[in-house]
Every structure is written in C-alpha cells, then in structure tokens.
Design a protein with these regions (language model features):
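Acidic/histidine-rich alpha-helical segments that form the ligand environment
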Residues: 87-115, 160-189, 196-213
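Extreme N-terminal starter segment of soluble prokaryotic enzymes
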Residues: 1-5
C-alpha cells in the first residue's frame, strides 16, 4: 500500500525543511527538496512506530504548500504557518493533539533521564541563529524545556519554564484552557511579525522535541552505546 504524505515545504534557496501536514511535528531537513523528500518515508515510519502503529509498505512525500523564507533553514529556523493551522479546532481534535504534545514531553524526559552522564558530549561547538548549539544532554534538555514560556506567550497565554518539561507544558495547557474561546484558534501576530495559532503551537512543541531528541539520542548512542539509551521516539 502506498501512503501519500501531504507536506509543507519551507526553504531558503535550496535549504529545505519539509513538514508532514497530518503527522503533527514530523519533519525532515535537506540541502535540497529532493533530499528532504527522500528522508520523509523514514521519518513517517519512525513517527508511526512512536504512535504504536504499523508503517505501510511505501510512503511518498507530496508538496501541497510552499513557503520561501529568509531564515536559516539549515539550522531549523522556521516561521511558517500552515494554511491548515488557521482553522478552528474541535474539542476532540484539541485533546488528541494535546495528548501527543504531552506524550512527546514525557518521552523526551525519559530519553534524557536514561543518559548516564548528562554532561558528556560528542558534538563539536557550533553557533546558530539562537546561539551555541546545545551539545550535552543537560544543555539539550534545558533548551527544549525552556521554549515553553515563549511558545505559549506567542498566543497570549501566561506560562513558565518551572519544573520538568512535562510539568511546565501541562500547566501551560491548563492556562490555555481557562480561556473561553481557545478552540477558535485565532491567528495572532507574534514576535518579529510571525503568525501563530494554537495549532501551530501544538505542532511546534512536537517538532522542536523531535529535533533535539534526535540530536540527544544520536549523541548519547555514540558516547554510551545504543543499548544503554532509551529510545521512546523510535528513531
């Protein structure tokens, strides 16, 4: 069976980020669209395994939307708002997406906790648009956890980064749910004129988790061996 994956292509020149529209947070990167598309079957197979589902025999990425960007796409800087992220949410849809974002946080925490020495690294120093690339498990965890306040603030929700990654994210959703009209998914102009919506925030959490979980898992596997590291994301 062939599974066609609708994708949004964000690019700066040829540098490409490719996002799976219906598999929230699933993404690939590449020096060209062709490279990013070639990686998508593996990403979707991993994502489905993470969900406890079987992957089909064949997966094909199909670009349905394009965003040309001036950002450092090669470093996963992104400001795209999908057309599909502008529609209101049903309560069931929201609960499903929230559950995925909270599962992602719990799995990120499990991966982090499994690493024997959280100050070890096998990654060279490198600077990106947001500063030095996180190199140790501690640095990756803190960086990933500490977008919580920022992401929620972009849709006018007061949140913080206190506690672990799951706890602060869960509190953020509780603060969101105190707003009577949150399911309307209003599009808001946030920092630097970037468009945000609740749907985008839900995607961003899982996408950002996956970026740094992949980096953490690969680094830790190199240092300690795969047998010693949890792999809840099924990379």
């Amino acid at each position: 069976m062939l599974l066609k994956i609708d994708c949004v292509w964000e690019h700066n020149g040829n540098d490409s980020l490719l996002y799976a529209v219906d598999y929230i947070g699933a993404y690939t990167r590449g020096e060209s669209l062709e490279i990013a598309k070639a990686k998508m079957p593996g990403e979707i197979a991993s994502y489905l395994k993470w969900l406890g589902e079987d992957a089909p025999d064949s997966i094909e990425a199909v670009v349905v939307e394009e965003k040309e960007s001036e950002l450092d796409i090669k470093d996963a800087d992104s400001d795209v708002l999908f057309e599909s992220e502008k529609a209101p949410l049903t309560a069931d849809e929201y609960e499903k997406l929230k559950s995925l974002a909270l599962k992602s946080a719990m799995d990120f925490l499990a991966l982090y906790k499994s690493i024997p020495d959280k100050s070890a690294t096998a990654i060279a120093e490198r600077k990106t648009f947001y500063g030095q690339v996180p190199r140790t498990a501690d640095e990756m965890y803190e960086h990933t956890k500490n977008v919580n306040e920022y992401y929620f603030a972009e849709i006018n929700v007061d949140a913080d980064n206190n506690g672990n990654i799951y706890e602060c994210r869960k509190r953020g959703y509780e603060a969101l749910e105190a707003k009577p009209d949150f399911l309307q998914n209003t599009v808001i102009e946030g920092s630097y004129g970037e468009g945000w919506s609740l749907r985008k925030v839900l995607r961003h959490f899982i996408w950002h988790d996956r970026i740094h979980a992949k980096a953490m898992y690969r680094m830790a596997s190199k240092v300690f061996g795969v047998a010693k590291i949890e792999n809840p994301f099924c990379f």
